[in-house]
């Protein structure tokens, strides 16, 4: 394991030059202190977890110190926000400190969010507040633990720096990690500003560093776009299968790597609600839970438009046509597994759709239903779950279909079925009310709840002794919370 001063930097994006980013130094926080750190994320940098408790850790990730090899840059990009094009966005409060490569040869971006004003801050102050930083940290690590591709979070650093939002809050910084911070909006920026040389340089950078296997294909850029389409179809299938609502699927929040990126007013479903809107600024429901699937395709089409200098329109349309079939196949496979099924039948999609319709009409907890379905043999499990439903006749009909489907699935033992279902159906998810409780404690100076919640969520499929309160339905006040974008 390494100490902080032993990290090895290789700042490949910074070498693209000033057309792609601007050199900016972080603005230090007052009295920086560790709120929470992720040992799993630290391991990706080969860092000894104990260094998180040292003063220099808070100073480095609180903007007071920099590695000599770091090259902090604010990236420029644009994007479609709620369907309308915004010509210039960029890192308004975040800095790419540099790229570190570990002993396995992996490169990781170190991106400091809340690092102060940049040329792209527009009307903002360049700061992030403690509550939004905690939410991003918890979500990044929780999604990774669920097997959902996501950026990672190394730590949150709190402070005494005052920041004004709807009220005065305390500033914080979160250190985000990813193999790249390039977004769909990077390509849109150079396309719409008519900078073909930079557009080509960016495309080569992404192809060579992040999709090198596509270089061997007859049409490398088309192969790369197809891979991006496939990754996004798989990602959004996992969002839908696990009830994750992103909240702000603007193209500047879409990673070129097909990972969950830029956490804002996100939420996991409590009761199943296909039309749930987690962002209270989304008045028309553009980014509602059920709309995430078509919006994913819309965003890919926006990226495709920006790639027309390199790829023919017909080829792009053909690649975009892969998205929905790939999404549907991935989603149905995940839902079969959540139902404990190991084989495929033609009517499985109808079985899933009928269940979700019943859950919607009865307000059934999405996560706990699937977990409890695997606790006992199918016949006993559906009997115990029956009382959660209002339409008893409808549920009874579904239960008979499900039991017959399980019977046809094979002669696996109940122990195997239970282990299989518990391996894909989490007991613990990041419910908004749990995050809110942890944030309230942290804002009063007690970081123990944030750390405990992070620890629980790092093992979402394992029953953890003494942690029953994290595996319960939310109280009435905690259901379907809508979250502000102000962060």
UniProtKB/Swiss-Prot annotation:
Q: Which Pfam families does the entry link to?
A: SelO
Which residues are Mg(2+)-binding? Answer: 253, 262
Which cofactors are named for this entry? Mg(2+); Mn(2+)
For this UniProt record, give its keywords in alphabetical order, as a comma-separated list: ATP-binding, Magnesium, Manganese, Metal-binding, Nucleotide-binding, Nucleotidyltransferase, Transferase
Where does this protein hold ATP? 90, 92-93, 113, 125-126, 176, 183, 262
Q: Which residues form the active site?
A: 252
Concerning InterPro entries, the annotation shows:
SelO (IPR003846)
PANTHER family recorded for this chain?
A: PROTEIN ADENYLYLTRANSFERASE SELO, MITOCHONDRIAL
What protein does this entry describe?
Protein nucleotidyltransferase YdiU
Point out the gene that encodes the protein. ydiU
